[in-house]
Amino acid sequence: MMQPSTSTNSIRPVRTRIAPSPTGFPHVGTAYIALFNLAFAKAHGGEFILRIEDTDQTRSTEQSEKMILDALRWVGLDWAEGPDIGGPHAPYRQSERSDIYKKHAEQLIENDHAFRCFCSSEELDAMRAEQMANGETPRYDGRCAHLAAEKTEQLVAEGKPHVIRMRVPTEGVCQVQDMLRGTVEIPWTQVDMQVLLKTDGMPTYHLANVVDDHLMDISHVMRGEEWLNSAPKHQLLYEYFGWEMPVLCHMPLLRNPDKSKLSKRKNPTSITYYRDAGVLPEALLNYLGRMGYSMPDEAEQFTLEEMIASFDIQRVSLGGPIFDIEKLNWLNSEWLRALTPEELKNKILEWASNSDKLTAIAAAIQPRIELLSDAVNWSGFYFQNLPDINAESFTHKSLTPEQIMDMLQLSLWQLEVLPTWSEENIYATLKGLAAHLDIKMRDFMAPFFIAIAGSTSSTPVMNSMAIIGADMTLTRLRHAVDVLGGLGKKKLKKLEKQAAELPDFLAAE
């Protein structure tokens, strides 16, 4: 089996990429990986590109894609090619490249490197259940891998739904070359017969990223270390196609202060949250640049240009970098203090002067003010980070603290997965949940005024949630749950079960 090079001194021009999925909020982890891809490419006189991995059509949204692109631009990252600016390798959305993937999947079948799998989801579930009962690692057992060609053709002709899976060796070890780790050995017995093309004709990440990286001339793939165990599949696909494989570099994952994987349950993870909270883009990019990386002069404060000028990928530490909000706030304060008063004034105006947001706030407070100075009291909570609240703030004559915490947490989970953040969807969700829990709407909404505005005397709270946006709303709701004492593991598990049984409140509208 051919072995990819780990050298950066190749004749091949350096081209790196970031390929976010538009299925949620723009994650700081995306900016972190994008930053190191950009810095590496620029340090070697190369190019950094962006493409959108929107093969999950049930979860991908245009709103999410726009949020991701806007957030990455805001933090200071630019790309040479992408869905918003075009380029010689267009289109840059995977949903617009399905014919390309289908052609390559069929090529693999023709060369006997892949096969059609007709197993139903029920069969696959039963297979996994039996394997787990026997103490085995759940994986596809290859039952369709050796179907006779005539049988396969018959099932296809009958229109039986199927996927395309890749063939993998059943014995031996795959040697993966990684820029930070050297040679990594992964037994083929740990590698599943990966689905490459789904029943809807859309590719999985594994096929799409290999095909796109090749066709877009990507020389170095720098991604999170969670993809290391998938590298054998990708390496095998490059061999099957007869293509030169990009150099691999698996970056350490960002961690919470307790060393767990960075999670929105413990820390805000959205770029837009930090923007709305008042973190400078230069400071956030600087902080992400310090995640597992050190400058040659050990400087703590540096610009993107300074990082690129001295960039060396071997200075990345494999120890899980800790994303600590307190340290980010400290670094942001250093950037703020380095500004002149004039520069600080401009930064404040730039941060607070979102025209659409100000118009929405003005409409909300207009019926409530007599003097322009009244606007300060009515609109302050729209701009603050977290309201100054405590457990006593949530005292309610009809609801216990436990009830309040439960309904806030259930609401939080429901709101996290809204396909579009709008007042209409917020209203439908909360109204449906209140009815489901048999709580009067007035009583149900009272804790939201406290969690979002810090007071029961404020503008309409669902309108306020729409204005401050999903990231800030969800962060304030998580803060409220923490203020009320937080959820223990036993209670959390019980609530998760209850949440899984909730109906789709948007579908009921």
Swiss-Prot record:
Q: So which domain of life are we looking at?
A: Bacteria
By its UniProt entry, which Pfam families does this protein fall under? Answer: Anticodon_2, tRNA-synt_1c
Q: Which Gene3D superfamilies match?
A: 1.10.10.350, HUPs
Report motif location: 'HIGH' region: 20-30
Q: Where is this chain's protein located in or outside the cell?
A: Cytoplasm
Where is Zn(2+) bound in this sequence? 117, 119, 144, 146
Q: Give EC number(s), comma-separated.
A: 6.1.1.17
Reaction catalysed by this enzyme: tRNA(Glu) + L-glutamate + ATP = L-glutamyl-tRNA(Glu) + AMP + diphosphate
What the entry lists under InterPro entries is as follows: aa-tRNA-synth_I_cd-bd, aa-tRNA-synth_I_codon-bd_sub2, aa-tRNA-synth_I_CS, aa_tRNA-synth_I_cd-bd_sf, Glu-tRNA-ligase_bac/mito, Glu/Gln-tRNA-synth, Glu/Gln-tRNA-synth_Ib_cat-dom, GluQ/Sye
Q: Which residues bind ATP?
A: 264
UniProt KW keywords = Aminoacyl-tRNA synthetase, ATP-binding, Cytoplasm, Ligase, Metal-binding, Nucleotide-binding, Protein biosynthesis, Zinc
Cited CDD domains: GluRS_core (cd00808)
Needed cofactors? Zn(2+)
Q: Recorded GO terms, molecular function?
A: ATP binding; glutamate-tRNA ligase activity; tRNA binding; zinc ion binding
Which PROSITE patterns would you find in this protein's record? AA_TRNA_LIGASE_I (PS00178)
Chief subcellular location equals: cytoplasm
Record keywords: Mitochondrion included?
no
Q: How is the cofactor bound?
A: Binds 1 zinc ion per subunit.
Where does the sequence pass through the membrane?
Answer: none
Q: Name one GO biological process term.
A: glutamyl-tRNA aminoacylation
Say which family it is in: Belongs to the class-I aminoacyl-tRNA synthetase family. Glutamate--tRNA ligase type 1 subfamily.
Oligomer status and interactors: Monomer.
The record describes the protein's role as: Catalyzes the attachment of glutamate to tRNA(Glu) in a two-step reaction: glutamate is first activated by ATP to form Glu-AMP and then transferred to the acceptor end of tRNA(Glu).
The protein in question is named: Glutamate--tRNA ligase
Organism name: Psychrobacter cryohalolentis (strain ATCC BAA-1226 / DSM 17306 / VKM B-2378 / K5)
Lineage in the entry? Bacteria, Pseudomonadati, Pseudomonadota, Gammaproteobacteria, Moraxellales
**Gene symbol of the encoding locus:** gltX
